[in-house]
C-alpha cells in the first residue's frame, strides 16, 4: 500500500502517516496520546519539571494510563485492565483519526489502517468500531521485519526511505 497509517499502541502511542509512499506526518507520545505506561505531561507534571522536582523523561515515563494510577498490567484487576485497554483503544483511534485528516491534505483519502504493539490484536476491533473502518493488527515481529527491510534497502544503496533521505555516510 502507498497510503497508510500505523499506530503503535502499547507502552506509549506513536502514529505515522504515509501518503504516496512518503512519510507525511507523525505523532509521538509526548505530545498527544498516552499509552499504557508512558504519556504526555499534564500541567501538574510540567510544573514539577519546571520546579526541578523531576526530569521531563521521568514525567513522561509516569504519564501513561496505568502508571498515572500507580498500576501495572500484572498488578491490576480484570476490570482495571479492561478499562486501560478501552482507554488505549480510544487514544489510538484519536491519533489515527487526526492523522487521517492530515493525509487527506496529501490526497490520501482512504489510507489503510494498521495497529502495531503487543495489545494490537486485543484492541483492533474496538478501534475499528470507533473509526467505522477496518483497522488491521500487525503481528508482533512486523516492526522488526520492517526495520530489517529498511536496513536492506540502505545496504543496497537506497537514497531515501519513505521520502526521508539516507545519510550519505551510511550509503554503500
Regions of interest found by a model, annotated:
Residues 4-8, 15, 114:
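Short glycine-aspartate micro-motif
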Residues 19-25, 29, 126-132, 155-157:
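A glycine- and small-aliphatic-rich helix-loop capping segment at beta-alpha/alpha-beta transitions
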Residues 125-126, 135-172:
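Glycine-rich phosphate-binding/hydrolytic loop that grips phosphoryl groups
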Residues 1-4, 12, 20-77:
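Glycine-rich phosphate-binding loop plus the immediately following alpha-helix
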Residues 107-127:
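Glycine-rich phosphate-binding loops at beta-strand->alpha-helix junctions
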Residues 7-10, 27-29, 92, 118:
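Fold-independent oxyanion-binding glycine-rich loops
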Residues 55-109:
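Adenine-nucleotide phosphate-binding core of ATP-dependent small-molecule kinases
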Residues 40-44, 80-83, 87-94, 122, ...:
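Conserved active-site and cofactor/substrate-binding residues in soluble primary-metabolism enzymes
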Amino acid at each position: 500500500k502507498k497510503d497508510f497509517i500505523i499506530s503503535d499502541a502499547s507502552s506509549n502511542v506513536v502514529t505515522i502517516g504515509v501518503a504516496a509512499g512518503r512519510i507525511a506526518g507523525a505523532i509521538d507520545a509526548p505530545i498527544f496520546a498516552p499509552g499504557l505506561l508512558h504519556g504526555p505531561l499534564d500541567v501538574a507534571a510540567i510544573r514539577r519539571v519546571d520546579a526541578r522536582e523531576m526530569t521531563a523523561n521521568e514525567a513522561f515515563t509516569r504519564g501513561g494510563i496505568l502508571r498515572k494510577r500507580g498500576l501495572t498490567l500484572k498488578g491490576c484487576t480484570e476490570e482495571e485492565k479492561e478499562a486501560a485497554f478501552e482507554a488505549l483503544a480510544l487514544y489510538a483511534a484519536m491519533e489515527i483519526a487526526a492523522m487521517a485528516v492530515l493525509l487527506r491534505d496529501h490526497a490520501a483519502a482512504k489510507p489503510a489502517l494498521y495497529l502495531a504493539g503487543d495489545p494490537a490484536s486485543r484492541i483492533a476491533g474496538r478501534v475499528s468500531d470507533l473509526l467505522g473502518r477496518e483497522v488491521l493488527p500487525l503481528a508482533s515481529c512486523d516492526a522488526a521485519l520492517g526495520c530489517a527491510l529498511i536496513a536492506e534497502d540502505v545496504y543496497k544503496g537506497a537514497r531515501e526511505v519513505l521520502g526521508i533521505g539516507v545519510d550519505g555516510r551510511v550509503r554503500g
